[in-house]
UniProtKB/Swiss-Prot annotation:
Signal peptide positions on this chain: none
Domain HTH gntR-type: 27-95
SUPFAM superfamilies with a match to the protein in the record: GntR ligand-binding domain-like, Winged helix' DNA-binding domain
Organism taxonomic ancestry: Bacteria, Pseudomonadati, Pseudomonadota, Gammaproteobacteria, Enterobacterales
Stated family: Belongs to the NanR family.
Disulfide bond annotation, renumbered to this chain: none
One GO BP annotation of this record: negative regulation of DNA-templated transcription
Pfam families from the UniProt entry: FCD, GntR
Gene transcribed to yield this protein: nanR
Protein name: HTH-type transcriptional repressor NanR
Length: 260
């Protein structure tokens, strides 16, 4: 008998006479191995940092082939439950915020291609960063405000180089997201910007110069409001900024489509 021997099924009548019989989808062996190992990890049968049994031992325990074991371990790695290094047995790990968000990445990128998808994510970013600037205005330390000012300075030095400006723009907002000290906020923020930037249309560099300067000036207003410890002013400045960014990229996208 192995780990997957089935138990006797209930009588069909127990499900109700009105229900039609329909076949249940069969799970792959690798999925069954994955589920069992995941439960063992969550029950702390294997502690964080501890190595799992070898592939050969897992094959014997579950009575499955090597491909099923390897597929199961790969799935657990994607969930952040194990780390796999070449030549070593899988080692139990704890999922990070980045791991959790990365699991959503494929679905998010697909959703962005749907009608209204970008607008929905822009609204999500607006709601999210609105809370961040309010928090920053009320709680940011002098050191954190100094980091924002430094990011702003780098922003100003990148106005004539679009690639550098985008990086400095992302860095400015990253510093803002870092202020609460919550790693989940950071993971969400990084993912949101990655998804939205990837969905932006390709436009000539000359089209972006004016946009870069406008964004920089709006960043100044945001930082000034945070320095003044005025959450309402910071929130208004942030909303003005993100609405302006959204309108600019929508206009550039339409212009790009007409030129094709």
């Amino acid at each position: 008998m192995n780990a997957f021997d089935s138990q006797a099924e209930d009588s069909p009548t127990s499900l109700g006479r009105s229900l039609r019989r329909r076949p249940l989808a069969r799970k792959k062996l690798s999925e069954m191995v994955e589920e069992e190992l995941e439960q063992m990890i969550r029950r702390h049968e294997f502690g964080e940092g501890e190595q799992l049994p070898s592939e050969r031992e897992l094959m014997a325990f579950f009575n499955v082939g090597r491909p099923s074991v390897r597929e199961a371990l790969a799935a657990l790695k994607r969930k952040g439950l194990v780390q796999i290094n070449n030549g070593e047995r899988a080692r139990v790990s704890r999922p990070s915020a980045d791991t959790i968000i990365s699991e959503l990445s494929g679905m998010a990128k697909d959703f962005l291609t749907h009608p209204g998808g970008i607008a929905h994510f822009e609204q999500l970013r607006l709601f999210f960063e609105s809370s961040l600037v309010r928090y920053a205005a009320e709680h940011a330390t002098d050191e954190q405000i100094a980091l924002l000012a430094k990011a702003l300075e780098i922003n100003s030095q990148s106005l004539d180089d679009n690639a550098l400006f985008i990086r400095s723009d992302v860095e400015f907002h990253r510093v803002l997201a870092e202020i609460p000290g919550n790693p989940i906020f950071m993971a969400i923020h990084v993912a949101l910007l990655d998804w939205l930037i990837a969905a932006r249309p390709s436009v000539p560099d000359r089209e972006l110069h004016e946009h870069n300067n406008v964004s920089y000036q709006q960043h100044i207003v945001i930082v000034d409001a945070i320095r003044q410890r005025d959450p309402d002013k910071a929130d208004r400045a942030l909303q003005t900024h993100l609405n302006s960014v959204s309108a600019t990229w929508h206009a550039l996208g339409k212009k790009s489509q007409k030129m094709r």
